């Protein structure tokens, strides 16, 4: 265990040997600091606070104390997920959970749960980005310079089987037209569709995966951003034209956010609605996806 001489660990606290505690960090009974965590200094870890493996708190981070430390109310507990990072001077309110890989900007005030790999800023904190390890910028550049049909109309995003599609767009004095064909350009025949609209700019949609259902997304009006994640790679793409669509195969975690005020997102689905087909918890998605990958490699 590595920690400053001014750090204090109370009896009943759990601190992994590989954790690093900075100046004037106090870990109270019932707090749990996981492997490879780092708390840089001037932070109190109250009873019930849990830092999961690899989490990092910058200097002067404030974790709101539970209303009654003796009550053991799990709803008051703060959980900082694996590899999550919290910037200097941020405030995390009681009961908040930061998902795996989430990033909290310096000085942010976080009063709501933060999804895995989301980047939040401001007071109150709002999602402004997602951590990516694959960039969609080259694909967007292709879309902006391509002239249909001189260049390919389907481009892989580098995230599993996710693909970006560009359709015919015809300009006419009577009104413009964009057209695509199912089972030819769109890789399945839909069983249903739905429209998403009137989404506040600070809200997210999606945040789930499907076990069997395939989806195809087109922002027919306005703009929105789509984050796709297959556990190995993660990428964000902006849908900003009615001739642009993105295909999500099964077992792809999908998020839609950054909706413009006039955005209308059309989603085609290969299956009828089935609540059992949804995976709404990212930790559950990780478990099932890893099992599926292991089965493929066996």
Predicted regions and their residues:
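Conserved metal-binding segment of the jelly-roll/cupin
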Residues: 42, 106-109, 113, 239-260
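Short beta-strand segments in beta-sandwich/barrel cores
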Residues: 61-63, 110, 222-227
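Non-catalytic, conserved peripheral segments adjacent to functional cores
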Residues: 140-244, 261-262, 268, 273-283, ...
């Amino acid at each position: 265990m590595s920690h400053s001489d001014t750090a204090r660990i109370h009896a009943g606290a759990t601190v992994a040997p590989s954790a690093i505690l900075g100046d004037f960090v106090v870990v109270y009974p019932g707090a749990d600091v996981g492997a490879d965590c780092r708390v840089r200094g001037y932070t109190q870890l109250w009873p019930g606070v849990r830092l999961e493996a690899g989490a990092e708190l910058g200097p002067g981070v404030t974790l709101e104390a539970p209303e009654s430390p003796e009550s053991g109310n799990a709803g008051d507990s703060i959980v900082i997920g694996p590899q999550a990072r919290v910037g200097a001077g941020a405030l995390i309110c009681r009961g908040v959970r930061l998902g795996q890989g989430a990033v909290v900007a310096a000085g942010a005030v976080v009063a709501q749960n933060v999804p895995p790999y989301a980047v939040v800023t401001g007071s109150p904190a709002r999602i402004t980005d997602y951590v990516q390890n694959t960039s969609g910028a080259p694909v967007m550049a292709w879309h902006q310079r391509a002239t249909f049909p001189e260049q390919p109309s389907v481009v892989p995003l580098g995230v599993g089987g996710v693909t970006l599609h560009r359709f015919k767009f015809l300009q006419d004095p009577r009104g413009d037209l964009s057209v695509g064909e199912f089972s030819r350009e769109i890789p399945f025949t839909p069983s249903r569709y739905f429209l998403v609209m009137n989404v506040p700019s600070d809200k997210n949609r999606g945040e789930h995966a499907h076990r069997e259902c395939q989806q195809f997304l087109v922002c027919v009006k306005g703009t929105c951003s789509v984050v796709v994640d297959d556990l190995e790679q993660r990428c964000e793409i902006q849908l900003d034209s009615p001739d642009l669509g993105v295909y999500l195969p099964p077992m792809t975690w999908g998020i839609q956010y950054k909706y413009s005020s006039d955005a209308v997102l059309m989603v085609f689905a290969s299956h009828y609605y089935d609540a059992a087909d949804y995976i709404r918890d990212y930790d559950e998605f990780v478990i099932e996806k890893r099992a599926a990958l292991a089965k493929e490699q066996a």
